[in-house]
Each structure stands twice: as structure tokens, then as C-alpha cells.
Amino acid sequence: MAITKDDILEAVGAMSVMELNDLVKAFEEKFGVSAAAVAVAGPAAAGGAAAAEEQTEFTVTLKSAGANKVGVIKAVREITGLGLKEAKDLVDGAPKPVKEGVDKKTADELVKKLVEAGAEAEAK
């Protein structure tokens, strides 16, 4: 009769800590493995590796409304879907983020739209 997985689990469950320690050492010797925790690679150090990583999400920020505040408020409403008062408050409170988590192409289009309306904007 063969030993089943359940028999092994029952035997291991009945062992003391010292016996389990000896069992682990025996496994290491028999199979040439290590019970040490696997080291997970952390984030790359700042510098060359970080610079090589391309940013995929951008935040479009309104830096200032410029001279054409009404046009900028209209552009902000169009971009965000905010109501008139909320868009005006956002424009009045510049610098403020207008749209977050957008891709590079969308961010560039939104910045262009804000600049055409008379605002000073950037994507980061």
C-alpha cells in the first residue's frame, strides 16, 4: 500500500518544531534545494533605469487662465464635463489638475485645446 498525500500531511502536522526543522534540512540535502525565502527584485534605483522607463499616464494641469478666462472655462467644461460654477472654480484656483491618468496623445490634445483657449497648461 502506497503512502498518500493525506498520510504525509497528517504526519507533518503531528511533528514538533524541532522535527520539522530536521525535515526541512533533510529535504535540502536530499534534493539540493534551499528553504530560504526567494528574494524579490525591488524597484530599480533612480537614474538610468528609471529614465529608460516611459511614462504612460499623464496629468493635464492648468497653470494659469491667461487673458481669455471665459474661453478657458469653456474649454475646461468641455474637457471635464463639469458644470459652469465648478469649471470657473477650477480655473480661478489654478494651478490645478484638469484631467488625470490619461495617455500621452490625449494629454497633448488637451493641453493644445487649453492653450488655444488662452490658458497656460502642461502635461506631466
Swiss-Prot record:
Q: PANTHER family of this UniProt entry?
A: 39S RIBOSOMAL PROTEIN L12, LARGE RIBOSOMAL SUBUNIT PROTEIN BL12M
> Taxonomically, what lineage is the organism?
Bacteria, Pseudomonadati, Pseudomonadota, Betaproteobacteria, Burkholderiales
Similarity-based family? Belongs to the bacterial ribosomal protein bL12 family.
Q: Which GO terms describe its biological process?
A: translation
Cite the GO molecular-function annotations of the record: mRNA binding; structural constituent of ribosome
Organism annotation: Ralstonia pickettii (strain 12J)
How it assembles, according to the record, is: Homodimer. Part of the ribosomal stalk of the 50S ribosomal subunit. Forms a multimeric L10(L12)X complex, where L10 forms an elongated spine to which 2 to 4 L12 dimers bind in a sequential fashion. Binds GTP-bound translation factors.
The record's section on Pfam families has:
Ribosomal_L12, Ribosomal_L12_N
Q: Name one GO cellular component term.
A: cytosolic large ribosomal subunit
Q: Supply the gene name.
A: rplL
Protein name stated in the entry = Large ribosomal subunit protein bL12
> What does this chain do?
Forms part of the ribosomal stalk which helps the ribosome interact with GTP-bound translation factors. Is thus essential for accurate translation.
The record ties this protein, via SUPFAM superfamilies, to:
ClpS-like (SSF54736), Ribosomal protein L7/12, oligomerisation (N-terminal) domain (SSF48300)
This protein's UniProt keywords: Ribonucleoprotein, Ribosomal protein
